Regions:
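Bacterial N-terminal signal peptides
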Residues: 4-16
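Short coil/linker segments at helix-helix boundaries
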Residues: 22-77, 81-163, 170-207, 212-226, ...
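Register position in tetratricopeptide repeats
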Residues: 56, 90, 177, 221, ...
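TPR/TPR-like (Sel1-like) alpha-helical repeat modules
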Residues: 78, 85, 89, 99-116, ...
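C-terminal substrate/ligand-recognition segments
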Residues: 373-376, 405-436, 453-469, 479, ...
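C-terminal structured "cap/appendage" subdomains that terminate the fold
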Residues: 458-528
Length: 537
């Protein structure tokens, strides 16, 4: 992009790799290539570009502080107050309820200052009016209404200034945000629209951090993830100063089952943001898929230390993007994944809830219910199912329909496996299929990017248990289309093929499992079984 400047933070930062804890020097840090022209003091322009670059990588509160510093030296710069206002929005990808009352009040004040400061160009006045559209009457208008109004306002800015790449990038982000408040679209029309806009920006400026970041979000769905791979491979190198830029590529890597790449990305993120539980969750999940249980356990232990040293609220708040819910869910998901992925049912049954948020607690109660049902403690399973029911009802009362449905899915699955343990096979398979169908009809949330347990895979597990290997194979293969390169998916598909009389397909899936776990640090029984099968002539 002509006229752009390369945003560089001077200085050398030592980083701590997760596994070795040895310090190594990082290169001079960058935030990407951003140029957002403003009619302010000449000295303000590079500072403003730097602050916008931080904003594009969701680097809170550093970006907010950067705008605030500009306001001290150039208080007549209207757009700096726009920057403060938009930075107060909270992470736009997390969804409802959005920013809290205090942040909203501060944002309204900043937007008002932006308007009263008298922006010198119509373009600047249009940006300010757009963000005011988001905040106006926030006490009376719900989050969804404000998000959609802002999307329309940014569309108008984008159409009025077709040569302004920042208008394009912020409009694409508004589209991405609107996806979270609308029903799932099987055609992904909005996501593809945002992606097309961002791809055009990247063609002119390949190192624009916002275009790279929001493109990954636009394609952050299993059906689209391949299209975000090029951006994922580039983003961390373009803006390594921002912890989220180092982590964000792992969204794509997880969707595609690229576990070594996910681990590398999250090691980098954790090296600069050591309390980043969301990144730690991704890393533990990736290790578990490759049967690197010793490495995964280190992540579990690190999670325990985060909780001990900071408490749930402090550890969740350490998320550098401000996505506190993603922190809470990560803290609960890490030990749950460690038990479930290893089939350690008694361990899963004994997990203790952190009692942070209902959404996070539901993860623990679901794992406890499944662990109890699979280990034969049906009374405990029923008690945990009741806890899930109470959480679901509470979420419905506050009109949090999305998360209420996610808990409903968990509850149906837990009831299904409890019913199976009671000998009610037909009821069990019916309920489990309901859970799988419900999950297929909903989208994953960035606060739980890697779903704890793909329900269609879990349906395959149940069908194997009730001696329907042919049907089980169909479900495993369907699950692997969306949850790629999963250890339990490959093993289940291999076992189902073997038991349904398809040795060729069984060999294919056992081989995939062995290749996936070529660097395993633990000899899991399923892996030993796969190697034994493949050794047969």
């Amino acid at each position: 992009m002509k006229g752009g400047i390369l945003i560089v933070i001077l200085g050398i930062l030592c980083w701590v790799p997760v596994a070795t804890a040895q310090e190594k020097p990082r290169d001079a840090e960058k935030l990407g290539n951003v140029h957002f022209p403003v009619s302010c003091l000449p000295a303000t322009q590079p500072q403003f570009d730097r602050a916008v670059a931080m904003l594009h990588s969701f680097w809170y509160p550093q970006g907010l502080n950067a705008f605030a510093e500009i306001a001290k030296t150039d208080p007549s710069c209207a757009m700096v107050y726009w920057g403060i206002a938009i930075s107060r929005r909270a992470n736009p990808m997390v969804g409802a309820p959005g920013a809290g009352p205090d942040a909203l009040k501060d944002a309204v004040e900043a937007a008002g200052k932006a308007r009263l400061a008298g922006a010198k160009t119509q373009r600047e006045r249009d940006y300010i009016a757009a963000i005011e559209t988001y905040y106006n009457d926030w006490e009376k208008r719900d989050y969804r209404t404000r998000v959609l109004a802002y999307e329309k306002a940014m569309e108008d800015v984008y159409l009025h200034y077709p040569e302004d790449p920042e208008a394009a990038v912020f409009y694409a982000l508004a589209i991405d945000e609107a996806v979270n408040v609308l029903p799932p679209d099987p055609n992904f029309a909005r996501q593809q629209k945002a992606g097309a806009i961002l791809e055009k920006v990247l063609a002119a400026n390949p190192e624009h951090p916002g275009a790279l970041h929001y493109l990954i979000h636009a394609y952050d769905f299993p059906q689209l993830a391949d299209r975000g791979l090029a951006a994922a491979r580039q983003y961390g190198d373009v803006a390594p100063a921002a912890p989220h830029a180092l982590h964000m590529p792992s969204h794509t890597y997880s969707m595609l089952g690229m576990w070594p790449e996910s681990i590398k990305a999250n090691q980098a993120a954790l090296s600069v943001s050591k309390g980043y539980a969301h990144a730690l969750d991704f890393m533990v999940y990736a290790y578990l898929q490759m049967a690197q249980d010793i490495e995964a356990k280190r992540g579990v232990d690190r999670n325990i230390e985060l909780l001990k040293s900071q408490g749930a609220a402090g550890a969740a708040a350490a998320n550098p993007t401000g996505a506190v819910l993603a922190g809470y869910t990560a803290l609960a998901a890490i030990p749950a994944r460690y038990a479930i992925e290893r089939g350690a049912w008694t361990e899963a049954a004994g997990l203790q809830p952190v009692h942070s948020t209902p959404v996070a607690d539901s993860i623990t109660y679901f794992a406890r219910a499944m662990g109890s049902a699979r280990s034969g403690n049906l009374d405990a399973a029923r008690k945990n199912i009741e806890q899930l029911k109470q959480i679901e009802e509470g979420l419905l009362q506050v009109k949090d329909d999305y998360w209420a449905q996610q808990v409903e899915i968990q509850r149906n699955a837990a009831i299904a496996w409890t019913a199976y343990a009671e000998g009610k096979k037909d009821a069990a398979t019916k309920l489990m299929r309901t859970a799988a169908d419900l999950e297929d009809g909903s989208e994953k949330h960035v606060a739980m990017e890697n779903r704890l347990w793909p329900m269609r895979e879990l349906l395959g597990d149940l069908l194997l248990e009730v001696n329907e290997p042919g049907l089980a194979l169909k479900e495993y293969e369907a699950s692997l289309q969306l949850a790629r390169n999963r250890y339990r998916g490959f093993y289940g598909a291999a076992k189902a093929a073997q038991r349904s009389g398809d040795p060729g397909k069984a060999r294919i899936y056992y081989d995939k499992l062995v290749v996936l776990c070529s660097k395993a640090d633990t000899q899991r029984p399923e892996l030993a079984e796969a190697k034994k099968y493949l050794a047969q002539k």
